[in-house]
């Protein structure tokens, strides 16, 4: 089972916000998911992001692949740097 970390659209028409979910790559965008690991609100000025960093790092360590947008969000929040440092530190 290929697992992805991706965005699920919530909110009303013209006012979206997104949940950052871990889901099977074959399930639909707003369909079944395994776990919610954060939220993303693009409408506020500073693009509000909340993350459960420990869970995101655990899923990345288990092989979950982030989507392009989620990869950018995780990079801006510094989570990918922590993952890289923990993976390649000796």
UniProtKB/Swiss-Prot annotation:
Keywords: Ribonucleoprotein, Ribosomal protein. It comes from the Bacteria. SUPFAM superfamilies: Ribosomal protein S16 (SSF54565). Coiled coil: none annotated. Pfam families: Ribosomal_S16. One of its GO terms (cellular component) is cytoplasm. The keyword Zinc does not apply. InterPro entries: Ribosomal_bS16, Ribosomal_bS16_dom_sf. The keyword Cell cycle does not apply. GO terms for molecular function: structural constituent of ribosome. One of its GO terms (biological process) is translation. Belongs to the bacterial ribosomal protein bS16 family. NCBIfam families: S16. This is Small ribosomal subunit protein bS16. It comes from Streptococcus pneumoniae serotype 4 (strain ATCC BAA-334 / TIGR4). The lineage of its organism: Bacteria, Bacillati, Bacillota, Bacilli, Lactobacillales.
């Amino acid at each position: 089972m290929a697992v992805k970390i991706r965005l699920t659209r919530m909110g009303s028409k013209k006012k979206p916000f997104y949940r950052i979910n871990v889901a099977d790559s074959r399930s639909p965008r707003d369909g079944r998911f395994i776990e919610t690991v954060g939220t993303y609100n693009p409408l506020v000025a500073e693009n509000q992001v909340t993350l459960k960093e420990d869970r995101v790092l655990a899923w990345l360590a288990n092989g979950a692949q982030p989507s392009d947008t989620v990869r950018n969000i995780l990079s801006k929040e510094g989570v990918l740097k922590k993952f890289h440092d923990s993976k390649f530190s000796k």
